[in-house]
Amino acid sequence: MKRLFLAIVAVIVAFTAVDAKPKQLKPWSKGTLDIHHISTGRGSTIFYILPDGTRLLVDAGDLGDPSRWTHKEIMPAVPNGDKTPAEWIARYIEHFSKPLDKELYLDYAMISHFDADHYGKLDKTAITVEGKPYKYTGMTHLANLIPIHTLIDRGYPNYDYPTAEAFRKRNGKLFFNYYELVKEREAKGLKMEQFKVGSDKQFALKSDAAAYPSFRIQNVAGNGNIWTGKGNETRSVIGPKAPQGAALNENSSSCVFRLEYGNFSYYMGGDISGFYSKKKNNYWLDVQTPVSKVIGTVDVAVADHHGYRDSMNDALLKALNANAIVLPVWDLYHPHPSTMKRINKQGVTEVFPAGMTAENLAKLTDQGLADAIRPAGHIVVRVLNGGKKYQIFVLNDRSLDYEIIYKSKVFTARGNK
């Protein structure tokens, strides 16, 4: 109880670092890059407003019925449980899209990989809708709240990694629910694409690309393949010496990319793993190490696999050398103490949780691992026009006013290497 009290006090003290009168984030303006790590308490979602106003969403998680956890294992749904995660995500996107002064839609939406906390859960919370061949949950729900011009995932159109049979067995009914949305989009002539490993053109700016030539998203890994670092060239993550039948699991099949704007750079790697069983010698499950060889340094990184024990191995942390790390977390087990030890050892000074249970914060505080952890909430990385400076804001995820509860110093972006 004492640890929990101290952790809560630490959060309250951090809140007071911002002016006593709550302030809202200044509206997006042309030339600014905003990256919103949305906290719902029920899964991962990242919303990007790119410098010309192009909009990208990565994931729309929904863990479904929370009753299978104890109250201490998972944080409350935020801002509350009155709406589904997809409805709260849609409201957030609508709110922060107002400065664009145009129709509400997403130019791109991508599912990093096929796990419930990234694209929905098929249980009693999934919504049956008359006339629809699929239930609404996560991305299938969001796609019916906000039009998506191009929907991207790791497997379209064949969904056959590691094999078609293994893919379907692994992902089951939840995938087939999503696949009905895919077929509906195809019938309507709406764009579907596979994440193109090696490409830096897939997420092109849609409104005024010529004005921002330094902006690009480099697709690094996904669906069993990885960029070599040369042109659009790719190779299999699993080398030729691996035993026959060796394959990545769903997490390590995640889509991975590097975003650049001016001198600023940012890493997103889904749930790829950085560890493997030495007893089984299944070394190919460590995707972080090969990624570390081509990714380059960044200013801000999203922790892979929510900061779990297999997240952010030493090779990747050293290669990224990030100033700040964002943690998409919501339960007692993420981030894991071993991961926080590695992050602290690397010298990362600011760690931003998009959600956090008070119990886990207390545990990490008690172990001396929470010094770099900032208040939890919606985490917004704002990159100023031209990409030379950036600042990180924490917005209140319990409020529909999205007040600023913490703000970092203004960082100087370090340049792309």
Regions inferred by a protein language model and the residue ranges of each:
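Flexible, acidic/histidine-containing loops and adjacent segments that form or flank the divalent-metal
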Residues: 21-34, 40, 92-95, 101-108, ...
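Histidine-anchored nucleotide/phosphate-binding helix
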Residues: 46, 139-142, 315-317
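Active-site metal-binding motif and surrounding structural segment of the metallo-beta-lactamase
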Residues: 51-56, 62-152, 290-308, 321-325
